[in-house]
């Protein structure tokens, strides 16, 4: 069903919301996302759900699969995102034809990232330079079959091709009008954390002299705060601002990740209420960028009153009394408060073994086999995280980017951007210049460790304070042409409130095994393997761009390299390294090499150098399992002082 038709059916005084998911990076993550979508769809009843589209159509197959699953299995109207620049027209055509075949009626037409330079697109001329081109194309080819959404930017949009222009939402209005006049039916905004920015934008749009935007549905996008780091990263990538009062609260809460999540929930709830009170009934729906996680979304819906409003609408539409009672029970609307008490059970997760299988509910669940089975009858309190079932459903709520649990639907850098440089070409060239030999690359890695530059292609922010504690070792390792893109020191029981190593709830202790991840040449890798392959204290994973893979880890093995022990809680493993996660990142890491190379024209010294690195280098992760030996890893790597 079309989104605009669904919105038209919302009675006055009621509210709606929708969910956004992104394609997981691993097969088991996709399986667990299916379970999570089932639970969220049944418990929270979104009006529709959308699926993001990877850079240059990189996730096309999985994105379409998820949209089909929403539409046909979960009976939730699906909206498929499509980006048009830097994408072959054949991919767009196939996606649209397949969407129509599966009964998907809604498309969010976006521009996407432009090519880095004229060589990047292999000389092809794209028919789609802007989102409006895609809107026109869909309308011309499919008439009114698809309901088309477009993006708007309450705080303004900065074009990476024209970085000297400052953000100005008013300057963007003519482009928004052009998209609507080309055939767009609804608008979803960029995320924001300043409610006043949206209120001001919405009021201006509604009263624009053209009258073109007076009645079109505008849905504000909401992204819960999952961690301090992810908030900083997302706001930088999206260009949205954060209220100083919110940043003060978050800074005071570091490193308590649970407190940061709760502060985020409170802020979003207040933001929703403020918007609802100041838009004269013109906006009564919100689009939640879930990041494939559910707990914060559930809490926001409950605490803001959106869930209750949505329930009233669904209740009025239900004629089957038995179905009504079942749904009410599942939403816990008739349940006493005692049923929400949290239950703690002993953990079955051994964390100190060299390379144990990953456990969630049983010892038979490995990295490749674990599935989240909390689906059909799980009540809303489970999505909130209450009780033992809630803990099982939200087992991955403390995410850790690409070093997180590969079974999690949220595994990876949860920003939806994929393996890109995250910088406009002009800014990237200022950061990294024009390297012509390997010593230039070594220098860039060392400058990043010393904070002389703010980013390298694989790490788009300054080094953490934790990394600085091992800077002298990393500088020497990079000096040996082992270029590091990830690392951590050994930690034995630091307080969870420690300003450098702490994370998670208060009153706990955190532990870390030392590891390092770097790009090395083939000869150095061979020498390392010859010496350390059979050492029980060392696990390594190595792969290159030719699909060659080497490891001394057991099949389906995984190493928990960061874990926390907290009062009244099961042990939480926030950082896990396994073959499945290494291979997912391996592919992306070499794509980043390619993105960097594409900054430079063909046959230039810099382009040739980086292409040689793609062909000759191996990505290697080395773990030292004795977390009580702070220097163990560096002895293995022969980095002595």
Swiss-Prot record:
Molecular-function GO term, any one: methylenetetrahydrofolate reductase (NADPH) activity
Knockout-associated phenotype: Leads to partial auxotrophy for methionine.
Associated pathway: One-carbon metabolism; tetrahydrofolate interconversion
Binding residues annotated for substrate, in chain numbering: 113, 190
Residues at which NAD(+) binds: 20-25, 52-53
Keywords for this protein: FAD, Flavoprotein, NADP, Oxidoreductase
Cofactor requirement: FAD
Name of this protein: Methylenetetrahydrofolate reductase 2
NCBIfam families in UniProt: fadh2_euk (TIGR00677)
């Amino acid at each position: 069903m079309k989104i605009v038709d669904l919105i038209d059916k919302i009675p006055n005084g009621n509210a709606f919301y929708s969910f956004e998911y992104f394609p997981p990076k691993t097969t088991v993550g996709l399986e667990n996302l299916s379970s999570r979508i089932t639970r969220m769809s049944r418990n929270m009843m979104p009006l529709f759900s959308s699926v993001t589209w990877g850079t240059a159509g990189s996730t096309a197959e999985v994105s379409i699969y998820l949209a089909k699953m929403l539409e046909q299995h979960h009976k939730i109207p699906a909206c498929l995102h499509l980006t048009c620049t830097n994408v072959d027209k054949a991919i767009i055509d196939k996606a649209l034809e397949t969407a129509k075949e599966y009964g998907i009626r809604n498309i969010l037409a976006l521009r996407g990232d432009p090519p880095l330079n004229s060589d990047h697109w292999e000389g092809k001329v794209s028919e789609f330079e802007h989102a409006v081109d895609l809107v026109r194309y869909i309308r011309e080819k499919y008439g009114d079959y698809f309901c088309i959404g477009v993006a708007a930017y309450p705080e303004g949009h900065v074009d990476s091709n024209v970085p000297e222009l400052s953000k100005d939402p008013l300057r963007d209005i003519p482009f928004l009008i052009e998209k609507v006049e080309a055939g767009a039916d609804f608008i979803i905004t960029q995320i924001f954390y300043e409610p006043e920015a949206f209120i001001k934008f919405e009021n201006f749009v509604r009263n624009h002299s053209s009258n073109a935007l007076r009645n079109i549905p505008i849905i504000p996008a909401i992204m819960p705060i999952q961690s301090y780091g992810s908030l900083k990263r997302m706001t930088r990538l999206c260009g949205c601002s954060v209220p100083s009062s919110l940043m003060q609260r978050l800074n005071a809460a570091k490193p308590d990740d649970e407190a940061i999540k709760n502060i985020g929930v409170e802020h979003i709830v207040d933001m929703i209420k403020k918007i609802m009170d100041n838009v004269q009934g013109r906006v009564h729906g919100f689009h939640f960028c879930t990041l494939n996680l559910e707990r914060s979304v559930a809490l926001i819906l409950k605490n803001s009153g959106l869930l209750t409003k949505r329930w009233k609408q669904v209740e009025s539409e239900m004629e089957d009394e038995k179905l009504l009672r079942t749904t009410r029970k599942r939403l816990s609307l008739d349940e006493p408060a005692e049923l929400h008490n949290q239950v703690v059970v002993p953990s079955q997760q051994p964390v100190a073994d060299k390379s144990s299988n990953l456990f969630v509910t049983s010892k038979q669940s490995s990295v490749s086999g674990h599935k989240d089975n909390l689906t059909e009858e799980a009540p809303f309190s489970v999505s909130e995280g209450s009780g033992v079932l809630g803990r099982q459903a939200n087992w991955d709520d403390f995410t850790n980017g690409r070093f997180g649990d590969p079974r999690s639907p949220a595994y990876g850098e949860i920003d939806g951007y994929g393996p890109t440089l995250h910088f406009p070409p002009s800014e990237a060239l200022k950061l990294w210049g024009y390297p012509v030999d390997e010593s230039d690359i070594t220098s860039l890695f060392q400058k990043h460790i010393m904070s002389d530059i703010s980013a390298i292609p694989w790490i788009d922010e300054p080094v953490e304070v934790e990394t600085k504690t091992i800077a002298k070792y990393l500088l020497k390792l990079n000096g040996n042409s082992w270029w590091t893109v990830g690392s951590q020191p050994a930690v034995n029981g630091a307080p969870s409130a420690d300003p450098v190593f702490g994370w998670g709830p208060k009153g706990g202790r955190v532990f870390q095994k030392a590891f390092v991840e770097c790009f090395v040449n083939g000869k150095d890798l061979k020498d390392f393997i010859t010496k350390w392959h059979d050492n029980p204290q060392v696990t390594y994973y190595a792969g290159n761009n030719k699909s060659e893979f080497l490891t001394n880890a057991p099949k389906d093995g995984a190493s928990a390299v960061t874990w926390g022990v907290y009062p009244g809680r099961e042990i939480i493993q926030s950082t896990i390294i396994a073959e499945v996660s290494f291979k997912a990142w391996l592919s992306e890491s070499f794509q980043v090499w390619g993105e960097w190379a594409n900054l430079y024209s063909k046959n230039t010294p810099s382009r040739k150098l980086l292409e040689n690195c793609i062909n000759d280098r191996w990505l290697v992760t080395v773990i030292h399992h004795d977390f009580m030996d702070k220097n163990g890893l560096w002895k293995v790597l022969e980095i002595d002082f």
